[in-house]
Amino acid sequence: MARAKFERNKPHVNIGTIGHVDHGKTTLTAAITMTLAASGGAKARKYDDIDAAPEEKQRGITINTAHVEYETEQRHYAHVDCPGHADYVKNMITGAAQMDGAILVVSAADGPMPQTREHILLAKQVGVPSIVVFLNKADMVDDEELLELVELEVRELLSSYDFPGDDIPIVSGSALKALDFLTENPKTTRGENDWVDKIHALMDEVDAYIPTPERDIDKGLLDGLWEDVFSITGRGTVSTAGIERGKVKVGDTVELIGIKDTRTTTVTGAEMFQKTLEEGMAGDNVGLLLRGIQKNDVQRGMVIAKPKSITPHTKFEAEVYILKKEEGGRHTPFFKGYRPQFYVRTTDVTGTIDEFTADDGSTPEMVIPGDRINMTVQLICPIAIEQGMRFAIREGGRTVGAGVVAKILA
């Protein structure tokens, strides 16, 4: 079956929902698609369509990142519904790496919770530039003053992580009430239901507040490989990748870099949202068909790049902040030789911390939760890293630190 062509007629923006488990991220994602579907800007997606993997259903929590697309009058959006459960923050890091902005969902009934805090920190670390807040479950709060208190708390929390808390738009509503009404009245337009209007108001703020990103299309191609790799027998391997910069089209020669030896291959096909794509650009999430590459040659964390534009490395210096116990970090100090996981882009790689230096040049015996420190890291396998790249340090399923690559050593 011939695939429809992907039309690029509006600015394209990647956004996602972040926030604490059960605060309503997936319900809101479904409500947005149903609201915009009424005016032809989306294919309506039910909650169950978005929250689709079998293991998610049993536990009622989202594990992998679901991608949906929709349009407002202004822009075309790709939306990732990021996982909210603590075990899966790792996936949030891979989902959030591609976001130009995020909708932070906070339950008005509960206020900010531990994962709200962790997601804001991670959004800062992976470089999500703008956040708009949706105070969900407002139907469960009768007291207007209570709503204002929660709003104030959210603003203070955002400010504490260097987001402009005072300026960030906050819209309150109920994703579930909007979704229930739309399920019964799918053609509801603006002005016909208060709860649905709140979803329109949210998207107005997203349109206005989250800037259209300036894409790095003129730099050499760099695709971060993430999510799925699958084989189409006879044609090669399709790799899903988020294009960080540059552009890619069928026929381009590219290198597959990181984890294993560098391989050179040719792009023989490209698609996005199940439509064929003439040219992928920075900001797109694309499926690329690679000639002569087997499924087991490719894994998450590799990058696809213009030949000779980036090299894999195993040793670097980094500026790192180690989370305090109250922020969900370690309870105890660590010493030289500590071996956590380093999450770079979409890769988790074990590395050893060889040495550390404080701001004043001294070399402390140990690093205490809450310290900011310069450290030297030796990874167990090479990955494509560059100066200025951000990463998270994880241990036993939780984020214990966040940092930025200061200098490549080897």
Swiss-Prot record:
One of its GO terms (cellular component) is cytosol. It catalyses: GTP + H2O = GDP + phosphate + H(+). Its EC number is 3.6.5.3. Residues 174-176 are annotated as: G5. Residues 81-84 are annotated as: G3. Keywords: Cytoplasm, Elongation factor, GTP-binding, Hydrolase, Magnesium, Metal-binding, Nucleotide-binding, Protein biosynthesis. Residues 10-214 form the tr-type G domain. Residues 19-26 are annotated as: G1. One of its GO terms (molecular function) is translation elongation factor activity. Residues 60-64 are annotated as: G2. It is an enzyme of class 3 (hydrolase). It is found in: Cytoplasm. Gene3D superfamilies: P-loop containing nucleotide triphosphate hydrolases, Translation factors. GTP binds at residues 19-26, 81-85, 136-139. Mg(2+) binds at T26. Pfam families: GTP_EFTU (PF00009), GTP_EFTU_D2 (PF03144), GTP_EFTU_D3 (PF03143). Residues 136-139 are annotated as: G4. The keyword Amino-acid biosynthesis does not apply. It comes from the Bacteria. Monomer. Belongs to the TRAFAC class translation factor GTPase superfamily. Classic translation factor GTPase family. EF-Tu/EF-1A subfamily. GTP hydrolase that promotes the GTP-dependent binding of aminoacyl-tRNA to the A-site of ribosomes during protein biosynthesis. This is Elongation factor Tu. The lineage of its organism: Bacteria, Bacillati, Cyanobacteriota, Cyanophyceae, Oscillatoriophycideae. The gene is tuf.
